[in-house]
Swiss-Prot record:
InterPro entries xref list: UPF0114, UPF0114_bac
Keywords: Cell membrane, Membrane, Transmembrane, Transmembrane helix
Species, as recorded: Shewanella baltica (strain OS155 / ATCC BAA-1091)
Name this polypeptide is given: UPF0114 protein Sbal_0780
Membrane topology term: Multi-pass membrane protein
Location(s) in or outside the cell: Cell membrane
Similarity field: Belongs to the UPF0114 family.
Single GO cellular component term: plasma membrane
Pfam families: UPF0114
NCBIfam families assigned: HI0507
Residue intervals passing through the bilayer: 15-35, 53-73, 109-129, 136-156
Main location: membrane
């Protein structure tokens, strides 16, 4: 009975596979949104102000960072928790594929969240005249929380890896 239970529990990791595949649909949606923003910009390129162009650029960078985060979580999560990816050894293989454990993934996700939060905070500051001070304060506090959390996770990971 115990053996059956253990095999069933081990096989249940495959439940995550469609979830990782679902992330690719979100990645596709982000790509559509990215190019939708580009296509909205092109006809108005000479009408748009500098601040609005910078805000749009920051939004596109934000979408790009989120897309990279999705790719990282999708591939590393699949490799760490479901099965190894067999993509061959050609030049198209990502250099970090198969080298990122769950701890490294956690730290990279935290760093990505801080980067995304930084871009969002920069967008808030660029549009500060239209945002109340208390909302700006909350954005800043949330960002600081992300930064401190990422730092703490990295520090704890360093402590556990070195055994100090």
């Amino acid at each position: 009975m115990e053996k059956v239970f253990e095999r069933l529990m081990y096989a249940s990791r495959w439940i995550m596979a469609p979830i990782y595949l679902g992330l690719s649909l979100i990645l596709f949606a982000l790509g559509v949104k990215f190019f939708q923003e580009i296509f909205h910009l092109l006809p108005n390129i000479f009408k748009i102000g500098e601040v609005d162009l910078v805000l749009l650029t920051l939004s596109l960078i934000d979408i790009t960072l989120v897309g990279g985060l999705i790719v990282m979580v999708m591939f590393s999560g699949y490799e760490n928790f479901v099965s190894q990816l067999d993509v061959g050894e050609d030049n198209d293989k990502l250099s970090w594929l198969g080298k990122m454990d769950a701890g490294s993934l956690k730290n990279k996700v935290a760093a990505s969240i801080v980067a995304i939060s930084s871009i969002h905070l920069l967008k808030v500051f660029m549009n500060a005249e239209n945002i109340s001070n208390d909302k700006i304060m909350w954005y800043l506090l949330i960002h600081i929380t992300f930064v401190l959390s990422a730092f703490a996770m990295g520090y704890l990971d360093k402590i556990t890896r070195t055994g100090k």
